[in-house]
Structure formats: structure tokens, C-alpha cells
């Protein structure tokens, strides 16, 4: 596999994983407040 393909896959994975995490963190912060 090319490094470009691996980089694109890692970026996609980070976006897919960080999406729900950011929502959960914001919800937790609002809930704590």
C-alpha cells in the first residue's frame, strides 16, 4: 500500500472516531454544568 493511501485511511478513521467522541464530551460537559 502507498503511504498516501494509509495517510488518507488514518485521517478518515480519526474523523469517524473523533466525531462521536466530541459529541459525547460536549454532552458530558453540558451535563456536568
From Swiss-Prot:
Topology within the bilayer: Single-pass membrane protein
Source superkingdom: Eukaryota
Transmembrane feature ranges: 5-25
Pfam families the UniProt entry points to: PSII_Ycf12 (PF05969)
GO biological process, one term: photosynthesis
InterPro entries hit by this protein: PSII_Ycf12_core-subunit (IPR010284)
UniProt keyword Transmembrane, yes or no: yes
Localization of this protein: Plastid, Chloroplast thylakoid membrane
GO cellular component, one term: chloroplast thylakoid membrane
Keyword field: Chloroplast, Membrane, Photosynthesis, Photosystem II, Plastid, Thylakoid, Transmembrane, Transmembrane helix
Keyword Chloroplast: yes
Family statement: Belongs to the Psb30/Ycf12 family.
Role, per record: A core subunit of photosystem II (PSII), probably helps stabilize the reaction center.
Subunit structure: PSII is composed of 1 copy each of membrane proteins PsbA, PsbB, PsbC, PsbD, PsbE, PsbF, PsbH, PsbI, PsbJ, PsbK, PsbL, PsbM, PsbT, PsbX, PsbY, PsbZ, Psb30/Ycf12, peripheral proteins of the oxygen-evolving complex and a large number of cofactors. It forms dimeric complexes.
Record's protein name: Photosystem II reaction center protein Psb30
Organism: Huperzia lucidula (Shining clubmoss)
Amino acid at each position: 500500500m502507498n503511504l498516501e493511501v494509509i495517510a488518507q485511511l488514518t485521517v478518515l478513521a480519526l474523523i469517524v472516531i473523533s466525531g462521536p467522541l466530541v459529541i459525547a464530551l460536549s454532552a458530558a460537559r453540558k451535563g456536568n454544568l
